[in-house]
Curated annotation (Swiss-Prot):
Enzyme Commission number(s): 3.1.4.41
CC annotations in GO: extracellular region
Function: Catalyzes the hydrolysis of sphingomyelin. Sphingomyelinases D are produced by some spider in their venoms, but also by arthropods such as ticks, or pathogenic bacteria and fungi. They might play a role in pathogenicity through different mechanisms, such as membrane destabilization and host cell penetration, but also pulmonary inflammation and cutaneous lesions.
Domain notes: The SMD-tail motif is highly conserved and may be responsible for structural stabilization.
Species of the source: Arthroderma benhamiae (strain ATCC MYA-4681 / CBS 112371)
Taxonomy of the source species: Eukaryota, Fungi, Dikarya, Ascomycota, Pezizomycotina
Gene Ontology process terms (BP): lipid catabolic process
Hydrolase listed as a keyword: yes
Biased composition (Low complexity): 317-328
Reaction it catalyzes: a sphingomyelin + H2O = an N-acylsphing-4-enine 1-phosphate + choline + H(+)
Signal peptide: 1-21
Details of cofactor binding: Binds 1 Mg(2+) ion per subunit.
Name of the protein in its database record: Sphingomyelinase D
Top-rank EC class of the record's enzyme: hydrolase
């Protein structure tokens, strides 16, 4: 275990993890010493609610500042953002095309932080990492994590680093695993058995494990919730019943999704649903408001057992004997980085 300063020195002087043939080296700006207000524990609370299970309304594909405003205005308490690295920086970008980028991640985070300090109950930001191992011109996983900690976490917004099963052997996954702090978690999207095995083999503490399963339209492969199958509903049910994850999220609920399928996903116990458009960035629209009314309708019918999560609910908390996730990097202690 080494201090933050020693870690940064190590990365700057000799440390590297190979990303597309080039090393990730901690950038010299901002400096390695964290600012005095980097991530204060006072910004994070985890008080119990009324006994009902907290539920997260996760806005889908929030790629612009206007999308942030719309989602929070609709009552979302978490935001899913597709993140793509370009030579000029990290962007809200799902497709990675010359014309597909939204606003910069820096600007998006500034908008989220501003709304959070004004009282909007955004609990966490889910970063759907499209090319996590990108490493060009100082744009890499290190620079992204610094943005998260300086702009989001210091105002009480937690972060979920979202990977796909095909990305878990990459250097960025290993880096996040080694330096994530108490406000961060790792999500893996894929098949239940594959994801469970990945988390177990890589030694991720249970409270830091988030499993997600879904489809751009889950109706296309919804399946039978009660049997073992590759269908979306069965995958989510197995994830919840396994007790191997801190949280289980489903995706993507839209105005096209069958209402009974939305309800069944909630009945098997998912902790939240990604909702929004199937193939477009988030903005204010009647279809999105209709989708929200469907989800809220179920929550209202089950208000004795479920409630909307608040900023006082820590999504990355779970009692586990599988190990703990000690605060690292921000607090000054991190594991050594394997090359």
């Amino acid at each position: 275990m080494v201090s933050l300063l020693r870690l940064c020195s190590f990365l700057l002087a000799a440390g590297s993890i190979l990303v597309q043939g080039s090393p990730i080296i901690a950038p010299s700006i901002p400096p390695c010493e964290p600012p005095s207000n980097f991530t204060g524990p006072s910004n994070f609370t985890s008080r119990p609610g009324n006994g009902a299970s907290p539920f997260w309304l996760i806005a889908h594909r929030v790629l612009t500042k206007d999308g942030v405003k719309a989602a929070l205005g609709h009552g979302a308490n978490a935001l899913e953002m597709d993140i793509t690295g370009w030579w000029s920086g990290w962007f809200g970008d799902h497709d990675g095309l010359l014309t597909s980028a939204g606003d910069t991640v820096s600007d998006l985070f500034d908008e989220i932080a501003s709304r959070r300090t004004q009282g909007d109950p955004v609990s966490f930001v889910w970063l759907d990492l499209k090319n996590p191992d990108f490493n060009k011109n100082g744009v890499n996983i290190v620079s992204l994590m610094i943005l998260c900690r300086e702009k989001l976490e210091k105002v009480g917004v937690r972060v979920l680093y979202g990977f796909y099963s095909s990305q878990t052997n990459g250097p960025s996954f290993k880096f996040v695993k080694q330096v994530m702090n108490e406000n961060e978690a790792i999500g893996i999207d894929g098949k239940f058995e594959t994801v469970e095995k990945d988390f177990e083999e890589k030694g991720i503490p249970l409270q830091k494990r988030v499993f997600s399963s879904g489809l751009f339209n889950p109706d296309f492969n919804f399946g039978n919730c009660e049997v073992h199958s590759s269908g979306v509903c069965a995958q989510l049910r197995e994830g919840k019943e396994s007790h191997e994850f801190s949280k289980v999220f489903g995706w993507t609920v839209s105005s096209y999704t069958r209402k009974d399928h939305v309800y069944k996903m909630m009945e098997v116990g998912v902790d939240g649903l990604i909702y929004g458009f199937v193939a477009s960035h988030y903005y204010d629209h009647a279809d999105i408001r209709h989708t929200l009314s469907t989800i809220r309708g179920w929550l209202e019918e089950h208000k004795d057992t479920h409630r909307l999560a608040t900023v006082d609910d820590n999504p990355w908390s779970s009692m586990s004997k599988k190990g703990s996730s000690k605060s690292s990097w921000v607090k000054g202690e991190v594991p050594s980085i394997a090359h």
